[in-house]
Amino acid sequence: MIKFLESLSSTEGDALAAFCEGSVFGLKAFGPVLSYGLGYDFVSAWEQRSEGERTAFLSKYYGTVTVHCTPDADREELLSFLKMVGFSALFGSAELLKNSYLHGTEGCVMALEKGRECTAKGSAEPDLELCWDNDYADFYEVLSESNPGYLTGDYADFLTDFSHRVRHGTAHILLLKSRGRPVATTAALVKTEGELFLGGVATLPEERGKHYASTCLLAFCDRYPEHRVFLCCRPEKQAFYEHLGFAKVNDFLELESSQK
């Protein structure tokens, strides 16, 4: 049975966090609730239970639905619910979604069990500066230019959302500068006490091949050496992340409304 969550007590929140731990789908689904709670109309959440045990958790954040479930989940009920609730974008395991959403885009979930296991060397360039949780405009500009379409909102929307999450310690942005010029980005889209979900890994086209991306990733891993680290990538990038110590642990599927 799927139930809408109107609120969460501290104890219920801790139990939900534990349920979502160890999965990029759980981490991404839990992120909006961790950052905003359930008191805003742009964050909604549901859980599925069977015989009293939680088997799935879903969140909807500005129209994007993320699904996290266990092997014991009632998958037919979940898929029926997704059709009913509606979404502008969908994210979950390819195993769960691919037969129902044939036009979705699949990719690889990569993970490090501990940040300290990262084998990235980074750039040896002497004049590099790591700028944490600042320079939002430069971060937005570099990411937008390097990866068109990654950011779906305008700068005002980005600033409002990310600055809120950074203030609450549930996200971080990192901008890399070379000789004072912004050249690369990486973000912790979700940060919990023991896990990171990284994204926004981007380098300006004319600056690629200089190990700037691995420099940013290494900076996060050095800062959080005991955290489990997740990121998602296209299949053609799998080898790059494996070279940095990451291992593929799952396949994801994402769907935009235009692909329905």
Question: How should each PLM-predicted stretch be described?
Answer:
Residues 92-97, 189, 229-242, 247-248, ...:
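Conserved beta-strand-loop-alpha-helix junction that forms the acyl-donor binding cleft
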Residues 59-61, 150-202:
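A conserved beta-strand-loop-helix scaffold within acyl/acetyltransferase catalytic domains
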Residues 54, 59-126, 251-257:
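Acyl-donor-binding surface of acyltransferase catalytic domains
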Residues 73-81, 203-205, 209-223, 243:
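Conserved acetyl-CoA-binding loop-helix of GNAT-fold acetyltransferases
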Residues 86, 172, 194, 227-228:
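Short coil/turn segments at beta-strand junctions that form active-site/ligand-binding loops
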Residues 1-28, 115-157:
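Short amphipathic alpha-helix that is part of the acyltransferase structural core
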Residues 3, 23-88, 183-199:
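Conserved donor-binding loop and adjoining core beta-sheet/short helix segment
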Residues 16-20, 79-83, 97-102, 130, ...:
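Alpha-helix C-terminal capping segments
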